[in-house]
Structure formats: structure tokens, C-alpha cells
Amino acid sequence: MQITKREFLKRLGLAAGAGLAGAARADEYTFTGETLPPGSIGDPTKPGFAKNIFPLPHTIEDVPSAFLKDGKVIQPAREVPVFHRTDVVVVGGGPAGFAAAVAAARQGAKVALVERYGSLGGLFTNGMVLIMLATERKEASGKWTFVTRGICEEFMKRARALGADVCNRIPSDTDDIHVQPTVDPEGAKYLMDTMVAEAGVEMFFHSWGVDVIQDGRKVLGVVFESKQGRQAILAKQVVDCTGDGDVFFAAGADYRQITHAMGWVTRLGNIDRVTA
């Protein structure tokens, strides 16, 4: 098959953007009709450069642009391509979304995790809110007991095992002082990536959940935006871990708007520790 240089560059640019967006998986890059020899991928001068090298859900020309009419911006109706089908889709890759996705995958479900940024952790890692809250309970005697279990407990123990103060303190059952552990943000991102990959969760970074797909009151999936455009994921179960209830809101659920407290997080480096 022969294509023009302009068409090749357009496909290459679109696919590069989709790859950076995390919305394109390796198994979508199909080559039909031929077995590719080494070095032929992406090279139109070699055998195997086939018509489906960068299959996109639509081309630029297929997407209708918004336009002005009587001073209003009108968005034409369009088909939203179904990009993926799964058992469970989790929207939001913060601590809650990370734990929900890993837990569901470990139970045998096929899980997709949609995260708007390029790393896991949400405000926990990217927002530097690094304190592990509610890890302990104060007994009647005044003693603090470590009560965290499940995936959070596993995360803390594995973070501690990484060393380099990734998790700087994990209280034991014998501690009689109250300690809130903190975690290094980059170490936490690495560990979350590791646990998600181990569980077999399918990750979609740089993908922002913007709407839901409904049949009456039943939610059948989510619509998300990425560099590849607006696409849909169909799922048997949809889990809202956006932090702000974005999926609930899009589905028409009742909500109450509140103002969260402000915080100022700082970190210091190259300072010797002194024990008081």
C-alpha cells in the first residue's frame, strides 16, 4: 500500500498524541495481510507498512467542529466511539481509585482505571498531601493501636520495604504514641504503578472522565476525553473515585456542594535530622 507523505505524517502525529495520552494500547496497532519483518514498523519504504498502522476511531475530518449561531456556541451531535469494554471501570486514580481497581482485579474482574493525570495518587502524591490518616485508633487506656488493614496496610508495608524513607514511620501494636506516617510522593507513585500492574489493571492516563452512559437510571459506562478525542468505555460496574463525585453528578445524583479547608504543604531537603 502506498500513502502520501502528508498522510503518513498526519497519522504519525495523531498516534503519537494518542500514545502520550495513554489512550492507545499496543494491541490496537494491527498490521493486516502481512508478517512484518524486523524494522518495518512505521517505515513506509519497507514491507509490512499496512493500512491499519495507526487505526483511530475517527479522522480529523470526521469530527464536527463547534460553531457560533446567534451568539451561542453549538456543538453538533456526533457518534462517540466505544474504545473499550470491561467488567469494572474506575474513574480517578487517587488512593481510593487505586485501591478499588486493585481489589476488583484481584477478585478476577477485568478492570480499567481512568486517570486524568500522568501518574497515580491524585492529591496524595501530586498534591503533596502525604500524611496517611486514620491508621491508628486510640484505646480507652490511651494507647494508640495500628488498625489499618487490606490494601492500605499492604501498601504501607511495601513502601517501608522500599527503603530510602519512602514510608518514614509505621506504628506497631505496642506503640503508645500517636504517629501519622508520611510517604514520599515519587516512591508512592512507583509502588502504586507496581501494584496496579501486578493486579492486571488496564491503565488509561491523561484521560478525563466527562460524562456517563445511561439506560434510564442504570449507568452503563463513562465518556472520557484524551488527546485522541472523546471516547467511551462500557462496563458492568462504574466506580466513582474522582474525589468530587463527578460521575455521580453526571448521572444526575443528588449532591451537596461544600468548601474544603485549605492546606499548605511544604518539603525540606538536605537538612540533617536532629532527635529532640
Per-range role (PLM):
Residues Q214-Q231:
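Conserved beta-strand-loop-beta-strand element in the redox core of flavoprotein oxidoreductases
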Residues R11, E225, C241-T242:
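Short, well-ordered coil/turn residues at beta-beta hairpins
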Residues G13, G39-E61, F67, F83, ...:
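Conserved N-terminal/central alpha/beta ligand/cofactor-binding core
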Residues G245-A276:
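Rossmann-like dinucleotide-binding core of oxidoreductases
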Residues V88-A109:
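N-terminal Rossmann-like FAD-binding beta1-loop-alpha1 element of flavoenzymes
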Residues Q237, C241-D246:
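Glycine-/small-residue-rich beta->alpha transition segments that form the dinucleotide
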Residues Q2, E7-T86:
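Extreme N-terminal leader/targeting segments of oxidoreductases
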Residues H84-T86, Q228-Q237:
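Core beta-strand elements of the Rossmann-like FAD/NAD(P) dinucleotide-binding domain
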